[in-house]
Swiss-Prot record:
Coiled-coil region(s): none
Name of the gene encoding the protein in the UniProt record: aprA
Protein name: Adenylylsulfate reductase subunit alpha
Primary role: Catalytic subunit of the adenylylsulfate reductase which catalyzes reversibly the reduction of adenosine 5'-phosphosulfate (APS) to sulfite and AMP during dissimilatory sulfate reduction.
Annotated site location: Important for interaction with AprB and for the binding of substrate at the substrate channel entrance: R282, K300
Enzyme Commission code(s) on record: 1.8.99.2
Catalytic activity: sulfite + A + AMP + 2 H(+) = adenosine 5'-phosphosulfate + AH2
Single annotated GO MF: protein heterodimerization activity
Amino acid sequence: MPKIPSKETPRGVAIAEPIIVEHSVDLLMVGGGMGNCGAAFEAVRWADKYAPEAKILLVDKASLERSGAVAQGLSAINTYLGDNNADDYVRMVRTDLMGLVREDLIYDLGRHVDDSVHLFEEWGLPVWIKDEHGHNLDGAQAKAAGKSLRNGDKPVRSGRWQIMINGESYKVIVAEAAKNALGQDRIIERIFIVKLLLDKNTPNRIAGAVGFNLRANEVHIFKANAMVVACGGAVNVYRPRSVGEGMGRAWYPVWNAGSTYTMCAQVGAEMTMMENRFVPARFKDGYGPVGAWFLLFKAKATNCKGEDYCATNRAMLKPYEERGYAKGHVIPTCLRNHMMLREMREGRGPIYMDTKTALQTSFATMSPAQQKHLEAEAWEDFLDMCVGQANLWAATNCAPEERGSEIMPTEPYLLGSHSGCCGIWASGPDEAWVPEDYKVRAANGKVYNRMTTVEGLWTCADGVGASGHKFSSGSHAEGRIVGKQMVRWYLDHKDFKPEFVETAEELKTLIYRPYYNYEKGKGASTCPVVNPEYISPKNFMMRLIKCTDEYGGGVGTYYNTSKALLDTGFWLMEMLEEDSLKLAARDLHELLRCWENYHRLWTVRLHMQHIAFREESRYPGFYYRADFLGLDDSKWKCFVNSKYDPAKKETKIFKKPYYQIIPTDA
């Protein structure tokens, strides 16, 4: 049938019948973000010393230099302890995440994270330092003055835990160190791993993974002794605020499709706190960062009347303070959103970041040259990490020293390294102070830090659940913990020979199913993107995010949901899952999009299943169970975990006990 011209023409590499490429390695690292850059750096360090024969391979669906959440750069490192102690770090994270966190994992990270930051600086990352007179030196000035964190010089802090950097090339610097450690022959880029594979002979044992090349028609099958999966969080699982021509602009990276959670869950890894989400309040439409404005420039967020709504709505915190929450200097992020949403519902929006007052107050004590420098820093805050926000300010003639700029809660994101804590249940360190319930013992009786409940499978960064506030530095440090443990595992399991249930041909057919769907059905319509025989990846995602937005507590319902709404969403998702078998790809880019959608569907459905199970509103401002408003510590001061049985194809959701390790008061 002749085709009519289509606005949605294929953009990727032409797709055709693939060849099969097989690999056999000892340590396989899936993902190229901060976590696996740390894992690679540390694994090579220990393997060179104790297992030089070990075959190590890092596989990334993108290019390592600009892969992951830090791809665009950052203007601050949000986790650097310095003079603070790990106990207080745990208290801060626990307070922000409403009292339910894995304190063993957070403490363990806190005692290691600074070393990663020192490495970043040594590798060339410009860090702001205080001079002898207490004045701020930017990265270039600090380097010229011979200042460094490793030497004991004080960083410029934008908050108790945050330090300022000139970080547009942050990820490039960290990736270069990982590349230097691995060598080019142990890195494969542009390969999208989409499915993990269990061992045929040993129950609950990882054996490998399968994916495909984004630049050539190849299906890649990997056998591995140990594996770490760190492919970020989940974005575009809810309808974004940026739609139409703005579609694709998001706060977290749009290439994070829930792959970490889906792939690990599908092989039986126990998941935890998947009901948790992060809804950041950011500059409207551009999603620009607000941290430097709040913390460094001391700006306030106000309603349309110029009122500090966190002050006028202070009474909203009382019910939480009475239960022991929202105490001290840290108001949980979700509760700050809770107060902002009230302003918006009651007609006191828009909400503004009062940039004008903040800058004018600072200008009062500055020379003209200092004023221009501060103004430049305000713009560089965006240029370092969110160029689109700088573009938006320029396009709307916004001068921050003359008028404020709107801020607004975004659509929900699923992640485990920012102010969110959904993810995979991972083992804590094998130390006496760690509760036994927090340790995952392998068949040999040993505990391997950060290993999932699937033997030989690790995760880190966004993957590890119940332990947020890692950010970039913590993700790298956690990856280093994993890299060392993987080498230890290899030394203990050298004789393991992985074997799959699936044949290579079966895997090829599964991976390229969207291509075969397109070839089979393309003659049924004159328009290649509207066809009775298949569904395009873009149209599938539009259906998915409409469903989650309306029934799963998205922006369209002001983050409200209920059992009835969730059940309706699950009913629609049953049909979506049926339709997912008909996803079609006209090129390799669309094949990528198809597999991202498989992962999105699985991840966001699990998120909604956890919300349905937890009958309370643990994170007001992130989501509300309208039929169970408020906290219920008597029933729900616990983790909600889930486990999928690959043999029975069933997911069970259950409670897991929470243990407080660090005392409440210092």
